[in-house]
């Protein structure tokens, strides 16, 4: 397969809006119209339907992982597989199916990390869980996980181009959370489990 075609396929895969799909399957409102307005698992959870939120989480993680795994299976190099993961991540954030206004990309990024290196993914997940439990803020947990990712990547993978891809994903995650950072600073950020109103 041509590398450009791989990137396009990974982007299309990443663009699949599982938050919208799962909400329709469970007869829920469009998650872009309540809570934070973000089409992601945390916002779907605000609907009160944990099954829909779980399906969203699994779907968003899976598409990131599948992009990396599929690229590796097709014989592409580790950095090319990581770039396929980046394409899937960008597909989620700038979904062609949602007029290029997708989600924050946290779950998809975790899937990409899992495809690249399980230990890097586990370190990010551990940090996310720890901060989420301590603060009850999904955004704070995501920011902390984003910061640790290129660090753990450098430790575990060395100075490789793949780590640069991880750093780029982390930077985009922080940028996508800019409104949440402002809300955290002024005390208006919603906590995990808050209602959708």
Curated annotation (Swiss-Prot):
Pathway: Lipid metabolism; phospholipid metabolism. It is an enzyme of class 2 (transferase). One of its GO terms (biological process) is phospholipid biosynthetic process. InterPro entries: G3P_acylTferase_PlsY (IPR003811). The keyword Transmembrane helix applies. It is found in: Cell inner membrane. It catalyses: an acyl phosphate + sn-glycerol 3-phosphate = a 1-acyl-sn-glycero-3-phosphate + phosphate. The chain crosses the membrane at residues 1-21, 78-98, 112-132, 155-175. Its EC number is 2.3.1.275. Pfam families: G3P_acyltransf. The keyword Cell inner membrane applies. One of its GO terms (molecular function) is acyl-phosphate glycerol-3-phosphate acyltransferase activity. It is a multi-pass membrane protein. Keywords: Cell inner membrane, Cell membrane, Lipid biosynthesis, Lipid metabolism, Membrane, Phospholipid biosynthesis, Phospholipid metabolism, Transferase, Transmembrane, Transmembrane helix. GO terms for cellular component: plasma membrane. Probably interacts with PlsX. NCBIfam families: glycerol-3-phosphate 1-O-acyltransferase PlsY. Catalyzes the transfer of an acyl group from acyl-phosphate (acyl-PO(4)) to glycerol-3-phosphate (G3P) to form lysophosphatidic acid (LPA). This enzyme utilizes acyl-phosphate as fatty acyl donor, but not acyl-CoA or acyl-ACP. Belongs to the PlsY family. This is Glycerol-3-phosphate acyltransferase. It comes from Aromatoleum aromaticum (strain DSM 19018 / LMG 30748 / EbN1).
């Amino acid at each position: 397969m041509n590398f450009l075609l791989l990137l396009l396929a990974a982007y299309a895969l990443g663009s699949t809006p599982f938050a919208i799909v799962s909400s329709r399957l469970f007869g829920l409102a469009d998650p872009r119209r309540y809570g934070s307005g973000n089409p992601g698992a945390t916002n779907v959870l605000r609907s009160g339907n944990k099954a829909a939120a779980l399906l969203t989480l699994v779907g968003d993680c899976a598409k990131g992982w599948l992009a990396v795994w599929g690229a590796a299976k097709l014989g592409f190099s580790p950095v090319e597989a990581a770039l396929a993961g980046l394409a899937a991540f960008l597909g989620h954030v700038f979904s062609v199916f949602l007029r290029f206004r997708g989600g924050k990309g946290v779950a998809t990024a975790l899937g990409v990390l899992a495809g690249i290196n399980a230990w890097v993914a586990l370190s990010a997940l551990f940090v996310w869980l720890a901060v989420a439990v301590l603060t009850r803020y999904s955004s704070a947990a995501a920011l902390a996980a984003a910061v640790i990712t290129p660090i753990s990547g450098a430790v575990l993978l060395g100075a490789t181009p793949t780590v640069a891809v991880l750093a780029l994903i982390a930077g985009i995650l922080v940028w996508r959370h800019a409104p949440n950072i402002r809300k955290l600073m002024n005390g208006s950020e919603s906590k995990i489990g808050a209602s959708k109103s």
